[in-house]
Regions:
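S-adenosylmethionine
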Residues: 1-442
Length: 442
């Protein structure tokens, strides 16, 4: 979307409106299609895609914005007449006028299934999620109907912009001086209430970046686990596009400068299983399969060595690293707030193939870490097939691995689950739905 806005030379209010129309329509698409179906003699899937997309934009303006109804209908009909044709514009006009007779709150009881008879279907239509995703999130969050509704509603909120100040290169104080606000959890985070993040000098100079708080905390948790002996060789096995690698690289070089947890010297055992702050002096190897993503990692990091390699079949010797990060490819169901189109593009049939890849990457990471070293397995998805099932399967197969309680290395955050894994949630923490498992090689 940002690239398209630049191409069309839209900025300021026009860019904001275009972004809201596009992302807002994508978030509400499932609900809007049910309403369109109720106002038409044709099912949405039978309507030509360009015409249907224009009507969806009009419905979003009618039901979720302050655009006057006559303006929403008129501009949409004009767009259809210009891009599709006169006949299609008459159809769009008829549908939108019917939609405009009720508010969203009035439409929902009409188009959504009865919650007593079909709670999953009711939530899917009311909160505009595919049914399979609602089922998967229900299984993962383990909450009641009200909590599920809160989670799905949070997926439809615009995410706040969170910045990360990379230690040794920037500071939270610098970000605050640039107009950001204090963050809740990560000691390196600040919230940007408005404006373009690229206009922040530290971001423009790659000393800071946009990074969700949960993503930052996953990195911090890995660096806080006490490791006996040497602690100078770190690996990011799936480093592209570089968000976690950028923070890992900075902490590896400069250490955890926040002072929120006890500091240990590099290679010194803290004598405790609790979180301790790394003091610096490590080297990061950032591995990425795709060349263009490896280039992004190279641009993001300062001191890391970046290699293009298949993480499931690495060239290095087993046991070469003290700490390993596995930010595994996943469905991204934890980031639906910032990628509203993903809920409609993802297919549950991809889960078996993804699961095999995730298991292969975690196995490779555990082979790559030395005995006594630690592996962080993270996904931006709470789907149990990508999280607990993957880690549990590996733990059953291998007797040289133990799961640590990831929550104990994140003392800033409550509500991360029953352990030993940590699960962030949009409705509880205001972050992406990031999952973390910490595993020590025996």
């Amino acid at each position: 979307m940002p690239a398209l806005l630049r191409e069309r030379r839209l900025s300021g209010r026009d860019a904001g409106l275009a972004t809201e129309l596009a992302y807002g329509t994508l978030r509400g698409l499932g609900t809007y299609d049910e309403i369109i179906a109720a106002c038409s003699d044709r099912a949405p899937e039978k309507v030509d895609p360009p015409l249907l997309d224009a009507i969806r934009l009009g419905v979003h303006q009618l039901l979720k914005t302050r655009v006057p109804p006559h303006a929403a209908v008129g501009t949409t009909v004009d767009l259809v007449r210009l891009r599709v044709g006169i006949g299609a514009s008459k159809y769009a006009n008829a549908v939108l006028r019917k939609v405009s007779t009720r508010s969203l709150e009035q439409w929902l009881p009409i188009v959504a299934p009865d919650p007593a008879e079909d709670p999953i279907g009711h939530l899917a239509v009311t909160h505009s999620h595919p049914r399979w995703i609602v089922t998967a999130l229900r299984d993962a969050v383990g909450g009641d109907f009200d909590e599920m509704a809160a989670l799905l509603a949070a997926d439809n909120e615009r995410p706040r912009v969170t910045l990360v100040a990379r230690p040794g290169r920037s500071s939270v104080e610098e970000l605050l001086a640039s107009g950001a606000e204090p963050a809740q959890y990560s000691p390196y985070a600040a919230y940007l209430p408005e404006g373009d993040p690229g206009a922040v000098l530290a971001v423009a100079e790659s000393r800071a970046a946009v990074q969700d708080e949960a993503s930052q905390l996953v990195v911090l948790a890995l660096t806080r686990v006490p490791v006996e002996g040497a602690d100078s060789r770190w690996l990011d096995l799936c480093a592209g596009p570089g968000g976690k690698a950028g923070l890992l690289d900075a902490i590896a070089t400069h250490g955890d400068e926040t002072g929120r947890v006890p500091v240990r010297a590099s290679g010194e055992h803290a004598g405790s299983s609790g979180p301790v702050a790394f003091s610096g002096g490590a080297n990061l190897l950032a591995a990425e399969l795709q060349y263009h993503r490896a280039r992004l990692v190279w641009q993001t990091t300062r001191n890391a060595s970046v290699v293009t390699v298949d993480g499931t079949a690495p060239a290095w010797r087993p046991g070469s690293f003290d700490r390993v990060m596995v930010d595994a490819p996943c469905t991204g169901l934890g980031a639906l707030r910032r990628r509203p189109e993903a809920r409609w593009r993802r297919d549950p049939r991809s889960l078996p193939e993804l699961g095999r890849l995730q298991r292969d990457l975690l196995t490779s990471a555990l082979d790559s870490v030395r005995p006594g070293g630690v592996v962080a397995y993270a996904t931006c998805s709470p789907h149990l097939a990508e999280t607990a099932a993957v880690v549990g399967d590996i733990l059953r197969r291998r007797d040289d691995v133990e799961a640590l309680d990831a929550r104990s290395y994140l003392p800033e955050v409550d509500g991360l689950g029953e352990g030993p894994y940590a699960q962030f949630w949009p409705h509880r923490h205001g972050t992406d739905g990031m999952f973390l498992a910490l595993l020590r090689r025996r």
